[in-house]
Amino acid sequence: MSETKRIARDQLNRYFDTFSRKFLMPDSPGAADVEVVGSEVGAQPVANRVRLLGVDYDPHTNALELELGSGDHRAYNPREVWAVEESDGFVSSIQIVRDDGAKELVNISRGSGAR
């Protein structure tokens, strides 16, 4: 059973480091879809079925970084970060609410199909 959790800013680095180490191994076949949604931009796909190599938070730049097989993507100034966590700790979805009100949606699958 999954659980939706709000991740406190002071826990972001540790939370996503633990997730990345446990589930995003070099041979992991998992894939991510990334989309930015905002009133000024509408819904804009950033990545589709791209291999997710890691998730990291940098407190100095205040950015949550997605390390993707196609290149890195950063969500700056996250006001809120939510994660859908499966019973084994796998994060299947991340929602980042930025200071400007836009949202970054990341859906992560364990299966094959990543590019």
Question: Where on the chain are the PLM-derived regions?
Answer:
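Eukaryotic proteins' extreme N-terminal regulatory segments
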Residues: S2-V36
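Short beta-rich binding modules
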Residues: T4, G38, D58-A63, R98
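Short acidic, glycine-rich loop/turn motifs
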Residues: V36-G42, L68-S70, I96-D100
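Helix-rich interaction surfaces within compact, conserved domain-sized segments
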Residues: P78-R115
